[in-house]
Amino acid sequence: MHRVTITLDDDLMEKLDAIIAARGYQNRSEAIRDLARIGIQQTAAETTSGHCVGAMVYTYDHSKRDLPRKLTQSFHHHHDLSRATMHVHLDHDQCLEVTILDGNATELQHFADHIFAERGVRYGRLVTIPAEPPAEGHEHHHEHDASS
């Protein structure tokens, strides 16, 4: 086992301590090891290739200079991946967006990484599910009745 020293800002330390208390960890090292494992698993899941559908969820401060314009440009640049977006005003400055994506897993991850890296984006997560690509010329001859 290796001993590592890290520096955390006060806000992040408070959040970490809250997780430790809520989950009953014996010490910070146990919590950080678990969080590192989760991050490693998530990174492995993000490296999935092939076609998938996904949900990109993020919050951002719309008052940050040029951020709404930059986000709009990114969405126009990746218009082939985005199917629908829901936008919610959380308060005077913070917004939440949920975007449904459809395409190659690597392209979806690249798009999400680009959005999440923008200054003013506070939180971001991409959830992907492997899916078959839509059939060319798919005709809609089946019912969507839940009772079928």
From Swiss-Prot:
SUPFAM superfamilies: ACT-like, Ribbon-helix-helix
Superkingdom: Bacteria
Classification via Pfam families: NikR_C (PF08753), RHH_1 (PF01402)
Keywords attached to this entry: DNA-binding, Metal-binding, Nickel, Transcription, Transcription regulation
Cited InterPro entries: Acetolactate_synth/TF_NikR_C, ACT-like_dom_sf, Arc_rbn_hlx_hlx, CopG, CopG/NikR_regulator, Ni_resp_reg_NikR, Nickel_NikR_proteobac, Ribbon_hlx_hlx
Binding of Ni(2+), residues: H76, H87, H89, C95
CC cofactor note: Binds 1 nickel ion per subunit.
Gene3D superfamilies on file: ACT-like. Chain A, domain 2, Met repressor-like
Required cofactor names: Ni(2+)
One of the protein's GO biological processes: response to nickel cation
Molecular function terms from GO: DNA binding; DNA-binding transcription factor activity; nickel cation binding
UniProt function note: Transcriptional regulator.
Family in the record: Belongs to the transcriptional regulatory CopG/NikR family.
Protein name: Putative nickel-responsive regulator
Lineage per the UniProt record: Bacteria, Pseudomonadati, Pseudomonadota, Alphaproteobacteria, Hyphomicrobiales
